[in-house]
Regions:
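Signal peptide-directed extracytoplasmic domains
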Residues: 1-12, 124, 142, 147
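Solvent-exposed coil/turn segments that connect beta secondary-structure elements
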Residues: 6-8, 25, 31-34, 120, ...
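Acidic/histidine metal-binding catalytic segments
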Residues: 38-45, 66-69, 105-115
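Membrane-active amphipathic alpha-helices enriched in small hydrophobic residues
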Residues: 45-60, 65, 69-79
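Secretory-pathway/luminal and periplasmic proteins that interact with or process carbohydrate-rich
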Residues: 28, 55-62, 120-127
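Extracytoplasmic and endomembrane cell-envelope/extracellular-matrix remodeling and assembly machinery
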Residues: 76-190
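Short pre-active-site segment immediately N-terminal to the catalytic Zn-binding motif
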Residues: 2-19, 81-88
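Catalytic Zn2+-binding segment of zinc metalloproteases
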Residues: 15, 25-42, 60
Length: 190
Protein backbone atom coordinates (compact mmCIF):
# COMPACT_ATOMS: atom_id res chain seq x y z
CA UNK A 1 0.00 0.00 0.00
CA UNK A 2 1.46 3.32 -1.03
CA UNK A 3 0.78 6.61 0.70
CA UNK A 4 1.61 9.81 -1.12
CA UNK A 5 1.46 13.48 -0.22
CA UNK A 6 -1.78 13.87 -2.18
CA UNK A 7 -3.58 11.46 0.13
CA UNK A 8 -2.09 13.06 3.23
CA UNK A 9 -3.22 16.53 2.19
CA UNK A 10 -6.61 15.34 0.88
CA UNK A 11 -7.53 13.44 4.06
CA UNK A 12 -8.58 16.24 6.40
CA UNK A 13 -8.26 14.11 9.52
CA UNK A 14 -6.61 10.95 10.75
CA UNK A 15 -9.83 8.92 10.56
CA UNK A 16 -10.20 9.66 6.83
CA UNK A 17 -6.64 8.48 6.22
CA UNK A 18 -7.37 5.39 8.32
CA UNK A 19 -10.53 4.77 6.25
CA UNK A 20 -8.53 4.71 3.02
CA UNK A 21 -5.86 2.47 4.53
CA UNK A 22 -8.50 0.13 6.00
CA UNK A 23 -10.11 -0.19 2.56
CA UNK A 24 -6.77 -1.02 0.93
CA UNK A 25 -5.85 -3.49 3.69
CA UNK A 26 -9.18 -5.24 3.07
CA UNK A 27 -8.19 -5.73 -0.59
CA UNK A 28 -4.98 -7.42 0.55
CA UNK A 29 -6.69 -9.44 3.28
CA UNK A 30 -9.32 -10.76 0.87
CA UNK A 31 -6.71 -11.52 -1.83
CA UNK A 32 -8.61 -9.40 -4.35
CA UNK A 33 -5.65 -8.85 -6.63
CA UNK A 34 -4.79 -12.55 -6.73
CA UNK A 35 -8.43 -13.55 -7.26
CA UNK A 36 -8.80 -11.03 -10.10
CA UNK A 37 -5.67 -12.37 -11.77
CA UNK A 38 -6.92 -15.96 -11.44
CA UNK A 39 -10.30 -14.98 -12.88
CA UNK A 40 -8.64 -13.30 -15.85
CA UNK A 41 -6.48 -16.37 -16.49
CA UNK A 42 -9.56 -18.61 -16.47
CA UNK A 43 -11.43 -16.26 -18.79
CA UNK A 44 -8.46 -16.06 -21.14
CA UNK A 45 -9.20 -19.51 -22.58
CA UNK A 46 -12.86 -18.67 -23.16
CA UNK A 47 -11.85 -15.43 -24.83
CA UNK A 48 -9.25 -17.12 -27.05
CA UNK A 49 -11.74 -19.84 -28.00
CA UNK A 50 -14.41 -17.37 -29.06
CA UNK A 51 -11.82 -15.24 -30.83
CA UNK A 52 -10.74 -18.30 -32.81
CA UNK A 53 -14.39 -19.14 -33.54
CA UNK A 54 -15.01 -15.59 -34.78
CA UNK A 55 -11.99 -15.83 -37.10
CA UNK A 56 -13.17 -19.18 -38.47
CA UNK A 57 -16.71 -17.83 -38.88
CA UNK A 58 -15.43 -14.76 -40.70
CA UNK A 59 -13.18 -16.85 -42.97
CA UNK A 60 -15.89 -19.35 -43.93
CA UNK A 61 -18.83 -17.01 -44.17
CA UNK A 62 -19.94 -14.73 -46.93
CA UNK A 63 -20.94 -12.27 -44.22
CA UNK A 64 -17.74 -11.08 -42.50
CA UNK A 65 -19.84 -9.07 -40.08
CA UNK A 66 -20.95 -12.24 -38.27
CA UNK A 67 -17.39 -13.08 -37.23
CA UNK A 68 -16.70 -9.49 -36.26
CA UNK A 69 -19.93 -9.33 -34.25
CA UNK A 70 -19.04 -12.53 -32.37
CA UNK A 71 -15.55 -11.22 -31.58
CA UNK A 72 -16.74 -7.80 -30.44
CA UNK A 73 -19.63 -9.14 -28.36
CA UNK A 74 -17.28 -11.58 -26.63
CA UNK A 75 -14.83 -8.81 -25.88
CA UNK A 76 -17.61 -6.58 -24.53
CA UNK A 77 -18.91 -9.42 -22.33
CA UNK A 78 -15.43 -10.06 -20.92
CA UNK A 79 -14.88 -6.38 -20.11
CA UNK A 80 -18.32 -6.17 -18.49
CA UNK A 81 -17.56 -9.23 -16.36
CA UNK A 82 -14.23 -7.76 -15.21
CA UNK A 83 -15.83 -4.42 -14.31
CA UNK A 84 -18.67 -6.08 -12.37
CA UNK A 85 -16.15 -8.28 -10.54
CA UNK A 86 -14.05 -5.23 -9.69
CA UNK A 87 -17.10 -3.35 -8.35
CA UNK A 88 -18.00 -6.33 -6.13
CA UNK A 89 -14.47 -6.41 -4.74
CA UNK A 90 -14.58 -2.68 -4.05
CA UNK A 91 -17.86 -3.04 -2.16
CA UNK A 92 -16.42 -5.89 -0.14
CA UNK A 93 -13.33 -3.82 0.67
CA UNK A 94 -15.57 -0.94 1.79
CA UNK A 95 -17.49 -3.21 4.19
CA UNK A 96 -14.46 -4.99 5.63
CA UNK A 97 -12.50 -1.73 5.71
CA UNK A 98 -15.18 -0.08 7.82
CA UNK A 99 -15.02 -2.94 10.33
CA UNK A 100 -11.24 -2.50 10.49
CA UNK A 101 -11.66 1.25 10.91
CA UNK A 102 -14.03 0.79 13.85
CA UNK A 103 -11.86 -1.94 15.39
CA UNK A 104 -8.93 0.47 15.30
CA UNK A 105 -10.96 2.99 17.31
CA UNK A 106 -11.80 5.47 14.56
CA UNK A 107 -15.15 7.02 13.74
CA UNK A 108 -16.87 5.02 10.98
CA UNK A 109 -18.41 8.19 9.50
CA UNK A 110 -14.94 9.14 8.24
CA UNK A 111 -15.29 6.67 5.36
CA UNK A 112 -18.50 8.34 4.16
CA UNK A 113 -16.90 11.76 4.61
CA UNK A 114 -13.97 10.76 2.40
CA UNK A 115 -16.36 9.39 -0.25
CA UNK A 116 -18.19 12.75 -0.20
CA UNK A 117 -14.92 14.51 -1.01
CA UNK A 118 -14.31 12.07 -3.85
CA UNK A 119 -17.81 12.73 -5.17
CA UNK A 120 -17.30 16.50 -5.09
CA UNK A 121 -14.01 16.12 -6.96
CA UNK A 122 -15.61 13.82 -9.55
CA UNK A 123 -18.34 16.37 -10.21
CA UNK A 124 -15.70 19.00 -10.95
CA UNK A 125 -13.82 16.71 -13.34
CA UNK A 126 -16.93 15.13 -14.85
CA UNK A 127 -18.76 11.89 -14.19
CA UNK A 128 -18.19 8.72 -16.20
CA UNK A 129 -21.07 6.42 -17.10
CA UNK A 130 -21.65 3.77 -14.42
CA UNK A 131 -21.06 0.84 -16.77
CA UNK A 132 -17.46 2.01 -17.34
CA UNK A 133 -16.57 2.34 -13.65
CA UNK A 134 -14.29 -0.10 -11.83
CA UNK A 135 -15.73 1.09 -8.50
CA UNK A 136 -19.35 1.35 -7.37
CA UNK A 137 -20.99 4.74 -7.87
CA UNK A 138 -19.61 7.12 -5.28
CA UNK A 139 -23.13 8.20 -4.32
CA UNK A 140 -23.95 4.54 -3.56
CA UNK A 141 -20.78 4.22 -1.50
CA UNK A 142 -21.71 7.37 0.46
CA UNK A 143 -25.21 6.07 1.17
CA UNK A 144 -23.97 2.59 2.15
CA UNK A 145 -21.14 3.80 4.38
CA UNK A 146 -23.34 6.44 6.05
CA UNK A 147 -26.00 3.83 6.83
CA UNK A 148 -23.42 1.35 8.13
CA UNK A 149 -21.78 4.04 10.28
CA UNK A 150 -25.16 4.89 11.81
CA UNK A 151 -25.85 1.20 12.49
CA UNK A 152 -22.46 0.77 14.16
CA UNK A 153 -23.12 3.71 16.53
CA UNK A 154 -19.43 4.54 16.77
CA UNK A 155 -18.06 7.64 18.37
CA UNK A 156 -14.45 6.80 17.66
CA UNK A 157 -11.64 9.24 17.06
CA UNK A 158 -11.64 11.51 14.06
CA UNK A 159 -8.37 13.26 14.64
CA UNK A 160 -5.26 13.64 16.71
CA UNK A 161 -3.06 16.64 17.33
CA UNK A 162 -0.03 14.73 16.01
CA UNK A 163 -1.77 14.06 12.69
CA UNK A 164 -2.86 17.68 12.30
CA UNK A 165 0.64 18.95 13.10
CA UNK A 166 2.22 16.54 10.61
CA UNK A 167 -0.36 17.41 7.94
CA UNK A 168 0.06 21.15 8.50
CA UNK A 169 3.83 20.87 8.28
CA UNK A 170 3.58 18.83 5.08
CA UNK A 171 1.24 21.36 3.47
CA UNK A 172 3.49 24.24 4.49
CA UNK A 173 6.50 22.52 2.94
CA UNK A 174 4.60 21.69 -0.23
CA UNK A 175 2.91 25.02 -0.82
CA UNK A 176 4.99 27.74 0.80
CA UNK A 177 7.48 29.68 -1.30
CA UNK A 178 9.59 30.90 1.60
CA UNK A 179 9.95 30.62 5.38
CA UNK A 180 7.73 33.64 6.08
CA UNK A 181 4.90 32.03 4.14
CA UNK A 182 5.43 28.81 6.08
CA UNK A 183 5.22 30.69 9.38
CA UNK A 184 2.03 32.46 8.28
CA UNK A 185 0.54 29.13 7.20
CA UNK A 186 1.31 27.53 10.58
CA UNK A 187 -0.18 30.49 12.45
CA UNK A 188 -3.37 30.26 10.39
CA UNK A 189 -3.67 26.56 11.19
CA UNK A 190 -3.49 27.21 14.93
Amino acid sequence: IGINTGLLTYAENEAELAAVLSHEIAHLDQHHYLRAQESQQQDQWLYLGTLLASIVLAAHSTDNDAGLALGLSTQAAMIDKQLRYSRLQESEADHIGMQTLVSAGFNAQAMADFFKKMDQQARIVGLMPEFLLTHPLTQDRIADSTLRAQQLHTKGELNSLDYQLARTRLMAILYAKDHNQQLQHYQQQL
